[in-house]
Amino acid sequence: MSHSSSGAPLDPVAFIHSQIRTVPDWPQPGVMFRDITTLLQSPKALRILVDLFVERYVDAKLDYVAGLDARGFIIAPIVAYELSVGFVPIRKVGKLPYKTRSESYELEYGSATVEIHEDACKPGDRVIIMDDLIATGGTMMAGRNLLERLGAVVVEGAAIIDLPDLGGSALLRNAGLPVYTVTEFAGH
């Protein structure tokens, strides 16, 4: 376990939380954007973050880690690599070159559609879905729906940050999807 400068053991969750920058009024007034770039710039923080996810899923017998476009693409492939499983991209509409399945959803500030290659996984494959944060839960729910339409077993939804006041993690859990997040922030 890492230690703080005082020699006390470092709480990995508190450390991860401290490495996330809040940008007020971005991308629109009233939104408190949780910026993970500061977390990713720190080799120590990135290692701790990846280790938290790997420790959680090392015995989950996964076949894939699916990442949600776009910030889910940052952490999901690293976790997939560390777990020696494949990575499945779930992209914004029009970005995948092969035959796709699509799903539309509502998000914190608008609506969108995501797609997955129709051969991204096969029936019975065990998958987790990853993103940087859970706000309204729409993106992750759409990803889950796509994976399940392909026959995959979605083991859990995972994110660095939960914004519980926006209700997404509760929505996902109420829909039967277990959710794991490293930290949470109140408000938007």
From Swiss-Prot:
PROSITE patterns: PUR_PYR_PR_TRANSFER (PS00103). Keywords: Cytoplasm, Glycosyltransferase, Purine salvage, Transferase. The keyword Ligase does not apply. SUPFAM superfamilies: PRTase-like (SSF53271). Signal peptide: none annotated. It is an enzyme of class 2 (transferase). One of its GO terms (molecular function) is adenine phosphoribosyltransferase activity. The keyword Phosphoprotein does not apply. Pathway: Purine metabolism; AMP biosynthesis via salvage pathway; AMP from adenine: step 1/1. It is found in: Cytoplasm. Its EC number is 2.4.2.7. GO terms for cellular component: cytoplasm. It holds the Pfam family Pribosyltran. InterPro entries: Ade_phspho_trans (IPR005764), Adenine_PRTase (IPR050120), PRibTrfase_dom (IPR000836), PRTase-like (IPR029057). One of its GO terms (biological process) is adenine salvage. It catalyses: AMP + diphosphate = 5-phospho-alpha-D-ribose 1-diphosphate + adenine. Homodimer. Catalyzes a salvage reaction resulting in the formation of AMP, that is energically less costly than de novo synthesis. Belongs to the purine/pyrimidine phosphoribosyltransferase family. NCBIfam families: apt (TIGR01090), PRK02304.1-3 (NF002634), PRK02304.1-5 (NF002636). This is Adenine phosphoribosyltransferase.
